[in-house]
């Protein structure tokens, strides 16, 4: 297929033509010389390979074109001086030129088959894009509901549709060349797409809402537990301080007892520890003993069990015979003895009077009361 880009109207204007041909095909380049042209001298075919080289020199006489100095294995020149190029590897990308009363430049390009295009659309901008994948010398046609609305020979076709007229429609992109044709069809449905985007947004928002509720609940629960712990520790501390510190009445009793006779025995307070206080109320848990007169009678002790009868004693062993006494020693000569010392009686002990209300210690029932310290 020959595509003429610039038509020759005025003489001596260069005409450029892109010639698309598939691989291993014979190429025919038209000289644009007709039978109306009379004898023409100086027709030449040239090719450009880093420099302009002459391929053949021809002359036309009547309906016959005669040329010389060209390779018949690669080229052939017809009666109207058109050039036929047989398939070979160096033909693509090589410019050819025919010169006579006018100049025509040919560019040989390889024609390749097309593959299905890609269709994409954007519901925000209402834009449809049709893009070519493979193929040369192609034309792209775009149809909406089997009606052609646009075409181009570029690689990308873009179309903005009217949202008021089209909401749910079928878009078809067709791409073809002289070798083959291919197409792709998409259903454009922006209503469902917008709804799905809204649903996705609401789903994400719900996830965020539940996450915020979960975090806020955890923070509130932590604050509530901290307050309860603080109040319980404060109450416990106050309770321990009340136990360790005596009441005002007990303090008065202790002061009154201090003014009494030091020999008197006073009743200890139930909260008065007889052991020294620990350095810290959390240091250790030590039982504290208090002495208090027993107000209730003691439980009667059970009767002792009867002892078994004594076992009979074995008969006594016979005594050995007595040893003879030694003879008495002679008494020393008597000396005058000193008169014995007179004996003085010991001094009587002082009589310490006891308080009339307090019986002697021997008559008091004293019990030990076990009190655990509360921590």
Curated annotation (Swiss-Prot):
Residue intervals annotated with topology Cytoplasmic: 229-375
sequence repeats mapped onto the chain: 305-310, 311-316, 317-322, 323-328, 329-334
Where is it mainly found? host cell
**Inducers of expression:** Expressed in the late phase of the viral replicative cycle.
Residues glycosylated per entry: 24, 80, 105, 122, 134, 145, 168, 176, 183
**Does the keyword Disulfide bond feature in the UniProt annotation?**
yes
Extracellular topological domain residue ranges: 17-207
Composition skew (Basic and acidic residues), residue ranges? 256-270
The secretion signal range is: 1-16
Asked if the Swiss-Prot or TrEMBL record annotates the protein with the keyword Cell membrane, the reply is: no
Tell me how this protein sits in the membrane.
Single-pass type I membrane protein
According to its UniProt entry, the function of this protein is described as:
May play an immunosuppressive role by inhibiting lymphocyte proliferation and subsequently facilitating viral replication and generalization of infection. Responsible for viral hemadsorption, which may help viral spread. Increases virus replication in the tick vector at the step of virus uptake or replication in the tick gut. May play a role in the host Golgi reorganization to yield viral factories. May play a role in host cell penetration.
Domain characteristics, as noted in the entry: The C-terminus contains repetitive amino-acids that may function as a cell-penetrating peptide.
Family in the record: Belongs to the asfivirus CD2 homolog protein family.
Can you name this protein?
CD2 homolog
Q: Which organism is it from?
A: African swine fever virus (isolate Tick/Malawi/Lil 20-1/1983)
Read off the lineage from the record: Viruses, Varidnaviria, Bamfordvirae, Nucleocytoviricota, Pokkesviricetes
